[in-house]
């Protein structure tokens, strides 16, 4: 495994709030992608009481070459998970929550119904909490998209992860254009939902391929794009092709805004839910400003 440049080195997680968060997740038997995927930002985020909860168990039915989450035959769904999630959020007094999941290709709806139950349970306790969900592709199972659009999370996120040319090696069980369809369908069925997608760089893609992904996401009416450095979790995972410089990330950010995204997060340590609460507020402000400009131009 290649040594990391200085701009990717982070401090070991510590602090009272960090341990409080970890203990609370254990108390309510909740999984987090922060731990399962070995996110480099876990210390910073947990000390701010930001966490991305991972529902539908801790075992994924796929084995993507970039992901550190365990794969295999998953356990049965925990019927108490929605209630436990809502209790934990209430205990932490969160204002914005991010929910993601493993892939559950074994379930009839891919797990979409469980996302709905979690969202409804959270809103029963506090309907002022804003909710962002990061979902798998549900294997294009019937009714999954309708369920998600109907429950209306504030932000719907589904990551394309990499450029189409690398899918066979990096995401062999996924299809790039199905991911685009999923994002476009959610926006079409409920235009009020902010849509979001992310891509990793440093896997061997070219700049031109990144620009094409940006264009494809804008064609799918995606509002928010995240761009971050791929980091190899273990020697068994896909090898890092190169470390993209902070200056290149700044360039990607400039290009993405020029293509019409409402919000862009681009940097070496950017992940799907990094600074999610702050970015959601900026996203709302940017949409309001865009609508005001459009109204002004129509007068």
From Swiss-Prot:
Main location as per UniProt: cytoplasm
UniProtKB keywords: 4Fe-4S, Cytoplasm, Iron, Iron-sulfur, Metal-binding, S-adenosyl-L-methionine, Transferase
One term of GO molecular function: lipoate synthase activity
GO cellular component, one term: cytoplasm
Localisation per UniProt entry: Cytoplasm
PROSITE patterns: RADICAL_SAM
UniProt-annotated binding residues for [4Fe-4S] cluster 2: 60, 64, 67
Requisite cofactors: [4Fe-4S] cluster
Protein name, per record: Lipoyl synthase
Record organism: Ehrlichia canis (strain Jake)
Gene: lipA
